[in-house]
């Protein structure tokens, strides 16, 4: 037990030192998202009617983020082993909080405080909890509008 406590203390120290010395990533802008396709995995609280078990549901998605706030979104349907038909939804960015309406995610959009590094995008949100991890590719790789 003492060894585990020492390891935990060392990890906490590394986290504090790393956080203090790490530069903040640049602010996220709409220009980084608009006109791109997001391919990502999101973890959200499981709601009634969602397949699977456990507290969190994993949603694999692709979304073309149009410059006007529209999004064309498709989600991987594990039961069919195929993507759902693309559906028109909405997306927004307020500060660093990115929100995307996603089929199968329940009545609320997935919202996360995001960071973007090159093609990578990742973030975590609260109320409700959400985790997003994926990449961005310029253009509409879904091929639908």
Regions found by a protein language model. Name each.
Residues 1-4:
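Positively charged n-region of N-terminal signal peptides that target proteins for export
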Residues 8-18:
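Bacterial N-terminal signal peptides
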Residues 18-88, 92, 97-145:
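Lipid interaction determinants
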